């Protein structure tokens, strides 16, 4: 398992409170192909309104941390969805650690987090979407194209993979 960093931008009339706010998300992935192609399993399986448009841009791949029993998932967000000090799951604090300049990512998105376990990563992703209307969205593949746009599009795919 690896993780990949995406910058996510959201546009939606019914989601005006997050319009044009870039959120950087770390996603666990299964590497099934070569280095340039990834199959993203249930990257976003979340409720969204029908008029939403989501743009994703791959901005980096997460590295494993040496001498550590878990993989460090590093995520950045410009918004204040998560209070790192008060994030709990089953009455245990989740493994979020905030930092400012431990790593030189050349990315400035505001609050920076290291997410160090899978339940913390799930919490990070689902906490962004827990108040939205039900509609299922999934990304199945992501390659090195600069941006993927998701939303209300006419799916006239002529390929049968």
Curated annotation (Swiss-Prot):
InterPro entries: Mrh-like. Plays a role in transcriptional regulation of late T4 genes. Modulates the phosphorylation status of host heat shock sigma factor rpoH which is an initiation factor that promotes the attachment of host RNA polymerase to specific initiation sites. This is RpoH-modulating protein. It comes from Enterobacteria phage T4. The lineage of its organism: Viruses, Duplodnaviria, Heunggongvirae, Uroviricota, Caudoviricetes. The gene is mrh.
């Amino acid at each position: 398992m690896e993780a990949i960093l995406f910058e996510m931008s959201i546009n939606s009339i019914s989601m005006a409170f997050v319009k044009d706010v870039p959120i950087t998300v770390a996603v666990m992935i299964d590497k099934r192909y070569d280095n340039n192609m990834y199959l993203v399993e249930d990257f976003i399986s979340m409720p969204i309104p029908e008029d939403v448009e989501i743009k994703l841009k791959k901005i980096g791949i997460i590295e494993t941390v040496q001498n550590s029993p878990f993989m460090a998932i590093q995520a950045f967000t410009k918004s204040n969805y998560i209070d790192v000090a008060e994030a709990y799951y089953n009455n245990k604090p989740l493994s979020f650690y905030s930092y400012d300049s431990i790593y030189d990512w050349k990315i400035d998105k505001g609050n920076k987090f290291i997410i160090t376990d899978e339940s913390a990563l799930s919490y990070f992703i689902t906490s962004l979407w827990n108040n939205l209307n039900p509609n299922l969205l999934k990304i199945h593949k992501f390659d090195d194209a600069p941006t993927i746009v998701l939303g209300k599009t006419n799916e006239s795919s002529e390929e049968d993979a």
